[in-house]
Amino acid sequence: MRWPTVPAPDGKGEMIDQDAVNELVDYAIAHGVNYFDTSPMYVQGWSEKSTGIALKRHPRESFYLATKLSNFHPDTWTREGSIAMYRKSFEDMQVDYIDYYLLHMIGGGGMEQFRKRYIDNGMIDFLVKEREVGRIRRLGWSFHGDIEVYDYALQMHDRGEVHWDFVQIQLNYVDWKHASGSNFKAEYLYDELAKRKIPAVIMEPLLGGRLSNVPDHIVARLKQREPERSVASWAFRYAGSPQDVLTVLSGMTYMEHLQDNIRTYSPLVPLTEEETQYLYDTADLMMEYPTIPCNDCKYCMPCPYGIDIPAILIHYNKCVNEGNVPESSQDENYRKARRAFLVGYDRSVPKLRQADHCTGCNQCSPHCPQTIDIPKELHRIDKFVEQLKQETL
């Protein structure tokens, strides 16, 4: 999903660094990775094509490929538009069958959207027939949002209306008990699948990177137990430990991320009960830090006014984790925190792309899997920035 990018030749935006993608894919396959997840909407619509180019250089039987019937504008929700999207995936990825095909982000718009997007237009029936003839090997869905839709989709399975071969859920040691935004507790999501023996594909094991960029005292707590292991490895061991997990996804942009994950899973050492409880206690400590549940998926982009939404939210979360979001000018480290926040903000986000340019058009929020009220958060951050600049906290 998060393939590496480089500046576009015309200076407008970014483009996928295909050489870097090829290198990552080659190394991954050489070291046992065999499941590659993409979508028509990832990386501004270029992910499927880039993934296909990289994988075409390897024997088809050496990897499993997963992609999705994504939620673009409702204009694409017709049967004709959906089938066109489905067929274009084959063309872009240069394959004649797809190993794992998903209904993308069910629950994101509630029951009405689920029906319109996948049931009323006959797409579930179409995809079941595609599975019967072998163009799809396994059919499932990914979930974000309304738990009523999650339960209904599983009831369809129970009633024999459609057999789901797998389901993709968000699972990590924070969301197991402390899910926020639109995320339902991972414990419930996983248990409902396990009782039906439906394999679970795990997304967001790092909670959008937040479980690899934790506050210093959390780093110290984890390093105290396993000094040689990365902070991220704890989250990946947790995600891979449940019995009915099929595979764990990771958006690995850099080679060092890939190598660290390979070390964690070569072989995977499941967590003990004591280690699992240690992580739950760690999650309780992390809940004292009020971060915004942005996972840098960039579904909210591009902003029509040029705002770099993910960069703003990620900078804010980074400062929260580092203790650089002062509540008052009377705070002991106010001067240091004020400077760290403002200097880091200008370095992370160009001035013309900062939160003060938000008009509140709300084009972004409906696309957010975490159901963040993005204009509200941007206005809150902009107000905080102005208070820091004017020293009126």
Regions picked out by a protein language model, each given a short descriptive name:
Residues 1-19, 68-81, 112-115, 145, ...:
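Active-site mouth loops of central-metabolism enzymes
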Residues 1-63, 126-132:
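N-terminal binding-site loop/beta-alpha segment at the start of enzyme catalytic domains
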Residues 13-28, 77-94, 145-157, 231-236:
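Short, acidic/polar
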Residues 29-30, 52-62, 87-96, 129-131, ...:
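Acidic (Asp/Glu)-rich catalytic clusters
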Residues 44, 106-314, 321-341, 366, ...:
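Beta/alpha (TIM)-barrel catalytic core signal, keyed to glycine-rich beta->alpha loops juxtaposed to Asp/Glu
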Residues 61-74, 103, 169-171:
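A short, structured active-site edge motif that brings together acidic residues
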Residues 90-114:
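Active-site groove signature of glycoside hydrolases
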Residues 322-361, 387-393:
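Short Fe-S-cluster ligation motifs
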